């Protein structure tokens, strides 16, 4: 796949990819970020695509996986932040065991 062919694909399919990411992430900026990341991954891995006629579904799958990874990362970050609210052993007054 040439860079010109990829650019044409992006021009044609970007809207569909953003809608797909929006259905998962429910936030326009996150959806745009997911699509940008997915398109970078697709370009870097373009040699792995065996059938050019499967390009649309292949990039859609990369987009879905990227969006889901973003959700998992966000949940991990929220968990770490919520753990900061719990007192440590020293702050709780309990002796160390």
Q: PLM ranges: what are they?
A:
Residues 3, 7, 28, 32, ...:
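Short, structured helix-loop boundary elements
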Residues 1-4, 20, 24, 89-92:
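A short, mixed-charge helix-start or loop-turn motif at secondary-structure junctions
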Residues 12, 23, 27, 44-48, ...:
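Conserved amphipathic alpha-helical interaction elements at protein-protein interfaces in regulatory
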Residues 19, 33-40, 44, 53-65:
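Structural recognition of an alpha-helix C-terminal capping motif at a helix-to-coil junction
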Residues 50, 61-81, 95:
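Arg/Lys-rich amphipathic alpha helix in sigma70-family domain 2
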Residues 1-19, 29, 35, 43:
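A short, charge-rich alpha-helical start-of-domain segment used by transcription regulators
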Residues 8, 78, 85-97:
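Acidic, proline/glycine-rich intrinsically disordered inter-domain spacer in sigma factors
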